[in-house]
């Protein structure tokens, strides 16, 4: 599915910037400006949340196969959900909408974005290049060009710094926790949570399940709750939800 690996699409961690406490504070403030949803795709009459799960699984495989930056998929999900809370979609057009979201997300968050022709080819020509371009334009107009968003993956390194996790573990944690977050976002109940909470759940799940050389995940629970201004019960519950959503991903692939 993918061309030759393109590691240039994944930026290195800027530890100097990530250690500045203003970065985390600004993320928490910008998070408050995101639209709040009580459920996804309320206005849709034909496509369902189950269709969303199938579409996002394809979109995630796409981003992973082409080694796009880890933030491309979460941004594509955000764009998709915001768009389909405003405009009607159909089962016939859903893949085209998803492809357009990946196209936009990759233009914003990666060095070498996906191309229209490549996305058309990967859809088995379910739509033409022109149809995809027009779909991209429709999404941009519906969102009034406000496509960027604070993402769960944006919180990862600032939180690692705030939790005093050794800097040499950051790249490994970022890679593993980003994958956990991306797979969990496919489930609609996770997408309804705030990015900071999703990040907390993804980080704790990764520490629990991967060989990260960190302390046990419970050692970070209280500090993480304090940093994000949530109760420990809330963060623990979200961690359990993310763990469950992460485990569902492989079942859906099978």
Curated annotation (Swiss-Prot):
Q: Which GO terms describe its biological process?
A: cell division; symbiont-mediated perturbation of host cell cycle progression
Family annotation (PANTHER family):
CYCLINS
Family, per entry: Belongs to the cyclin family. Cyclin D subfamily.
Looking at the keywords, is Metal-binding present?
A: no
Pfam entry (one): Cyclin_N
Output the InterPro entries linked to this UniProt entry.
Answer: Cyclin, Cyclin-like_dom, Cyclin-like_sf, Cyclin_dom_herpesvir, Cyclin_herpesvir, Cyclin_N, Cyclins_cyclin-box
Name recorded for this polypeptide: Cyclin homolog
Q: Which domain of life is it from?
A: Viruses
Q: Point out the gene that encodes the protein.
A: 72
UniProt key word Cell cycle: yes
**Keywords tagged on the record:** Cell cycle, Cell division, Cyclin, Host-virus interaction, Modulation of host cell cycle by viral cyclin-like protein, Modulation of host cell cycle by virus
Give the matching SMART domains: CYCLIN (SM00385)
